[in-house]
Curated annotation (Swiss-Prot):
Family: Belongs to the eIF-2B alpha/beta/delta subunits family. MtnA subfamily.
MF-aspect GO terms: S-methyl-5-thioribose-1-phosphate isomerase activity
Protein name in UniProt: Methylthioribose-1-phosphate isomerase
Top-level EC class: isomerase
Reaction catalyzed: 5-(methylsulfanyl)-alpha-D-ribose 1-phosphate = 5-(methylsulfanyl)-D-ribulose 1-phosphate
GO terms for biological process, alphabetical: L-methionine salvage from methylthioadenosine
Site feature Transition state stabilizer, where: 160
Role noted for this protein: Catalyzes the interconversion of methylthioribose-1-phosphate (MTR-1-P) into methylthioribulose-1-phosphate (MTRu-1-P).
Gene3D superfamilies listed in its UniProt record: translation initiation factor eif-2b, domain 1, Translation initiation factor eif-2b, domain 2
Length: 348
């Protein structure tokens, strides 16, 4: 670990002390910093669905600890642990359908449940801790790899929130940004608002301010003008699911940024751990896209902003075709100009 890793990494969204799970309620940022106690698996699933916690890696970590909480409520002499825990696994799996890390983490926990041995809750806790700790280590590795791709530039543009709030710590795309800023490869960050939940305004800007990294907020509609100005060298984003050919599902608006970046000659980077890559999904057409309540678009901060009687369409994610992506950065390495053959080679 380098000193810059600590200098620009102070935020944690998921806390586990061996007995209890606490989640930073991201719905209340930046006005309030409140950690919620998560007493059981039902509360963990609700926290994921209601976006107390969000970001694919953080969702997976939360789900893993949720399985631990579920196992601890069962008698030590439970005859069939998998049968007893299956409803809890299914409840967690149904909480957010697009984030593949959720299903990856649950599969790892299910594998432990299927192993013969004593004290299953303790073994599940050890596995959940490994998932959490490995995510942090992988993020720091991706930070180094992604920053190494960058020539010195005035700034980068990022979308949604991909930092410590969305992961086990440090971040995916924001991990690259943290590393690049620590190496003085960039001077500042532009973050777009990311409607309708305003993750860029509420979360990314807040997180970067906490860590002393200069950040300017923009409306999504300003992205094209920003790119045309020449101030941005890269667009750096995360991912909720990457298909076998490199097509990438991420927060709604990512696809538009990729189109704009290609038009303006700005390079486009996706940063995600290999747990986000779904080799069983051939391309982006097979990625399920969550649609959220229309009230999120028709209102803002709990107040109506649209004309009464207006409808809305509210997909939470979109799919960026692989041909618009210059690099996918993972903890295993970098795939430039991704396609199916390159993704297959990475995952071997």
């Amino acid at each position: 670990m380098k000193p810059t890793d600590l200098a620009f990494d102070t935020v944690r969204a998921v806390l586990w002390d061996g007995t209890s799970l606490k989640l930073l309620d991201q719905r209340r940022l930046p006005r309030e910093t409140v950690y919620l106690d998560i007493p059981d698996v039902g509360a963990a699933a609700d926290a994921i669905r209601e976006m107390v916690v969000r970001g694919a890696p953080a969702i997976g970590i939360t789900a893993a600890y949720g399985v631990v909480l579920a196992a601890r409520r069962l008698p030590a002499d439970t005859p069939d642990w998998l049968d007893a825990l299956t409803p809890d696994l299914e409840r967690l799996a149904a909480s957010r359908p697009t984030a593949v890390n959720l299903f990856w983490a649950l599969a790892r926990m299910k594998s432990v449940i299927g192993q013969v041995g004593a004290d299953l809750p303790a073994r599940l806790e050890a596995e959940a801790r490994r998932i959490h700790e490995d995510d942090l280590a992988d993020n720091r590795r991706m930070g180094e790899l992604g920053a190494a791709l960058m020539d010195p530039a005035e700034a980068v543009l990022t979308h949604c929130n991909t930092g410590s709030l969305a992961t086990g710590g440090y971040g995916t795309a924001l991990g690259v940004i943290r590393s690049a800023y620590g190496q003085q490869r960039i001077k500042k960050v532009y973050a777009d608002e990311t409607r309708p939940w305003l993750q860029g305004a509420r979360l990314t800007a807040w997180e970067l301010v906490q860590d002393g990294i200069p950040v300017d907020l923009i409306c999504e509609g300003a992205a094209a003008s920003l790119m045309r100005s020449g101030r941005v060298g890269w667009v750096v984003v995360g991912a909720d699911r990457i298909a076998a050919n490199g097509d990438t599902a991420n927060k709604i608006g990512t696809y538009a940024l990729a189109v704009l970046a290609r038009h303006h000659g700005v390079r486009f980077m996706v940063v995600a751990p290999t747990s986000t890559i779904d080799m069983d999904t051939p391309d982006g057409a097979g990625i399920p896209i969550e649609e959220r309540p229309v009230s999120e678009v028709l209102g803002l901060a709990g107040q109506p902003v649209a004309a009464e009687g207006a409808g809305a369409w509210n997909p939470a994610f979109d799919v960026t075709p692989a041909e618009l992506i210059d690099a996918i950065v993972t903890e295993k390495g970098v795939v430039e100009r991704p396609d199916r053959a390159k993704m297959t080679a990475l995952m071997k």
